[in-house]
C-alpha cells in the first residue's frame, strides 16, 4: 500500500514538473549581464540575475 502510494506520488510529481527543453540557461554574476541576452530572447531588457542565472521577464 505505501509502496504504491509513493510510486504514484513520484509519477505525479514527474508529470507536473515543467518541461524546460529548449530553455537557454544564461549564467550571470550581475543583472547587467542579463540585459543583452534577454533582449535577444524576449525583445525587452527586463531581467534580473538570481542565483547566478538570468531571469528574463519580457515586455509589459
Curated annotation (Swiss-Prot):
UniProt-listed SUPFAM superfamilies: Scorpion toxin-like
Identify residues that carry Cysteine amide.
59
Q: Name one Pfam family in it.
A: Toxin_2
Which residues does the UniProt site feature Basic residue of the functional dyad point to? 48
Q: What is its subcellular localisation?
A: Secreted
User: Annotated Gene Ontology MF terms?
Assistant: ion channel inhibitor activity; potassium channel regulator activity; toxin activity
Site note Aromatic residue of the functional dyad applies to 57
Tissue occurrence: Expressed by the venom gland.
Write the record's keywords in alphabetical order, separated by commas. Amidation, Disulfide bond, Ion channel impairing toxin, Neurotoxin, Potassium channel impairing toxin, Secreted, Signal, Toxin, Voltage-gated potassium channel impairing toxin
**Hey, what's the signal peptide range on this chain?**
1-23
Q: List the disulfide bonds.
A: 28-49, 34-54, 38-56, 44-59
For this record, the Gene Ontology CC terms, alphabetical, are: extracellular region
Domain text from the record?
A: Has the structural arrangement of an alpha-helix connected to antiparallel beta-sheets by disulfide bonds (CS-alpha/beta).
Q: Which family does it belong to?
A: Belongs to the short scorpion toxin superfamily. Potassium channel inhibitor family. Alpha-KTx 06 subfamily.
Protein name from the UniProt record: Potassium channel toxin alpha-KTx 6.10
What organism does this protein naturally occur in? Opistophthalmus carinatus (African yellow leg scorpion)
